[in-house]
Swiss-Prot record:
Function comment: Glycerophosphoryl diester phosphodiesterase hydrolyzes deacylated phospholipids to G3P and the corresponding alcohols. Binds human IgA, IgD and the Fc portion of IgG but not IgM, which may contribute to evasion of the human immune system.
Record-level Gene Ontology MF annotations: glycerophosphodiester phosphodiesterase activity
The encoding gene: glpQ
Misc. comment: The outer membrane of T.pallidum has no lipopolysaccharides, few proteins and is a fluid and very fragile bilayer. Its lack of surface antigenicity is thought to contribute to the ability of the pathogen to evade the human immune system.
Gene3D superfamilies: Phosphatidylinositol (PI) phosphodiesterase (3.20.20.190)
Enzyme class: hydrolase
N-palmitoyl cysteine-type lipidated residues: 21
Annotated GO CC locations: periplasmic space; plasma membrane
Protein name according to UniProt: Glycerophosphodiester phosphodiesterase
Length: 356
């Protein structure tokens, strides 16, 4: 369900309404400075740190030996050379899953930017980015990344936030693993446990978000900020069990309906919509953007708005430059956090200094 009801609010009028919607405006480096260096590599994270991002984002999945791995998907096919290194380890569906490999095995893989596979040919998703397979990046664990960030903070005397997305908890439950519990335990080990700490935990899985809020945070004596990421139902992002115990596609339609954001607000501090969910594309043009009803719904629910994902390569027709896109999101939709592959441009737009 994409846009079940329609309310139009134009930027000039809405700017006054959103003044209290967001606190400090912040930039999250989505998978690091992924527009410049392969996503989720240490090089990508250190570049984003230097560029002045407020937070570094991590996608977290589990290995066969229960180690948290930083990777953009629980499927290895289109980000590593797994098909060459372990050609017989795919499942019946033809995919190679992180959870079927140990940390030692995963360390043997070369990591690169996301790509499409046609036969034996690899085509980058974003053709003008860092060349595929050069110079030979590797996957790493979530704990290694936390240690890396702590090291940067120690040597520079400058802090940066952690923005951790728990990937497909439902899939990990199917595999008999509790990725949410392991993620929270590791965050607490490194001192990320209260609302005053520089940390957000995000997931698409609303059922798991409720479990984190009701069960896991009290269990670990934690109170970190939670973000519900929003998807369209036809993206097939999440599964849940029906009344017969069968796993079925999760229906996100209610999040786009009246009262949806109020329901989310019972468990989350904010929501993470795609920017396309906030703007009526067919009715928008340069200098005149029409906002979707989700914008006012988020404000009415007093939720933080964390918008995904701004990229040079995917700017809409109504935003000619990255600055125009940041302006629309921060000043018209009322977003207080924008996730981007180009954190330096977001930092510059907000008038914040780079760290180096």
């Amino acid at each position: 369900m994409r846009g079940t009801y329609c309310v139009t609010l134009w930027g000039g009028v809405f700017a006054a309404l959103v003044a209290g919607c967001a606190s400090e405006r912040m930039i999250v480096a989505y998978r690091g400075a992924a527009g410049y260096v392969p996503e989720h590599t240490f090089a990508s994270k250190v570049l984003a740190f230097a560029q002045g991002a407020d937070y570094l984002q991590q996608d977290v999945v589990l290995s066969k030996d229960n180690q948290l791995i930083v990777a953009q998907s629980h499927i290895l096919d289109n980000m590593t050379d797994v098909a060459e290194k372990f050609p017989r380890r795919q499942r019946a569906d033809g995919h190679f899953y992180v959870i079927d490999f140990t940390v030692e095995e995963l360390s043997l893989l070369r990591a690169t930017n996301s790509f499409y596979t046609r036969g034996k040919r690899h085509t980058p998703v974003y053709g003008q980015r860092f060349p595929l397979w050069k110079p030979g990046f590797r996957l790493h664990t979530f704990e290694e990344e936390l240690q890396f960030i702590r090291g940067l903070e120690q040597t520079t005397g400058k802090k940066i936030g952690i923005y951790s997305e728990i990937k497909v908890p439902w899939f990990h439950h199917q595999e008999g693993k509790d990725i949410a519990a392991l993620t929270l335990a590791l965050l607490k080990k490194y001192g990320y446990q209260s609302r005053s700490d520089l940390v957000y935990v995000q997931t698409y899985d609303f059922n798991e978000l409720k479990r984190i809020k009701r069960e896991l945070l009290p269990k670990y004596e934690m109170n970190v900020k939670l973000i519900q990421r929003v998807a369209y139902t036809d993206q097939r992002e999440t599964q849940e069990k029906d009344s017969r115990g069968k796993w079925i596609n999760y229906n996100y339609n209610w999040m786009f309906e009246p009262g949806g954001m109020q329901k989310i607000a019972k468990y989350a501090d904010g929501v993470g919509p795609d920017w396309r969910m906030l703007i009526e594309n067919e009715w928008s043009k340069v200098g005149a953007v029409r906002l979707s009803p989700m914008v006012s719904a988020i404000q009415d629910a007093k939720l933080e708005c964390h918008v995904h994902t701004v990229r040079k390569e995917t700017l809409p027709s109504y935003a000619r430059t990255m600055d125009e896109m940041f302006s629309i999101l921060f000043k018209q939709t009322g977003a207080n956090v924008v996730l981007t592959d180009f954190p330096d441009l977001g930092v510059k737009f907000l008038g914040k200094p780079a760290r180096y």
